[in-house]
């Protein structure tokens, strides 16, 4: 299946470029409490290089594949360690086994919290995939490098819940996956960092399309170029994705 790729990354505010510390404007935009290598405003030390501390929010099979790709970044040898802390937040489920993300986290011995509990640890960046809960501004601001959303549609189309179901019901012929930066107060609104599109297979069900987009989403979390700087959240996450890409290629 041919994948059409579109990348979109807006201009950074002055002072947020490679080799420079983020300006106050950029820190406010990205939710930075302080400069990398300094204090985050709550007394915690903000890291400017790996290994990173990541909190993942997700529920379904699509989210599980994104989590699996991030989890693969943890065990590459101490000298190449990219993530030294990966914890998971999911939502309560009526099933005793829990949702796919919880099943994977338990099997992989990752710490799991049930929303609204998000733990009390310190993290560098958050990652959201198919979570279905609106994150408060106070929560977003706890992450020095902000929170990224991996969303199974070509935003802005089908922002909000059940994008795969809407894609099928409305007969869309093209869909995709978007990686974007989360903003407070609204679902799936913020700068688009990366977007890839695929044709919708004819007569596909929502479950079949979810499988297609799960593979695409995981592939995007494995294949993104390394940025020249880690001084802002966008650069941090593209660096993570590039390193994960190398893990899966080796």
Residue locations for each model-derived region?
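One-carbon transfer enzymes
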Residues: 2-250
């Amino acid at each position: 299946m041919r994948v059409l790729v579109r990348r979109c990354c807006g201009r950074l505010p002055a002072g947020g470029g490679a080799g420079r510390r983020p300006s106050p404007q950029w820190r406010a935009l990205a939710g930075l409490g302080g400069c990398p290598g300094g204090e985050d405003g709550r007394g915690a030390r903000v890291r400017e290089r790996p290994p990173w501390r990541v909190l993942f929010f997700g529920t379904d099979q699509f989210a599980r594949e994104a989590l699996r790709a991030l989890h693969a970044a943890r065990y590459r040898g101490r000298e190449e360690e990219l993530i030294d802390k990966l914890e998971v937040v999911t939502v309560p489920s009526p099933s005793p086994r829990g949702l796919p993300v919880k099943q994977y986290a338990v099997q992989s011995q990752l710490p799991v919290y049930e929303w609204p509990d998000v733990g009390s640890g310190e993290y560098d960046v958050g990652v959201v995939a198919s979570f279905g809960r609106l994150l408060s501004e106070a929560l977003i601001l706890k992450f020095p490098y902000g929170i990224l959303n991996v969303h199974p549609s070509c935003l802005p189309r089908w922002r909000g819940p059940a994008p795969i179901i809407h894609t099928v019901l409305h007969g869309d012929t093209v869909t995709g996956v978007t990686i974007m930066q989360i903003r407070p107060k609204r679902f799936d609104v913020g700068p688009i960092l990366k977007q890839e599109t695929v044709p919708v297979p004819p007569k596909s069900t929502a479950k079949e399309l979810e499988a297609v987009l799960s593979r695409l989403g995981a592939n995007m979390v494995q294949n993104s170029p390394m940025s020249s700087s880690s001084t802002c959240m966008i650069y941090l996450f593209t660096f993570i994705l590039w390193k994960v890409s190398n893990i899966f290629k080796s």
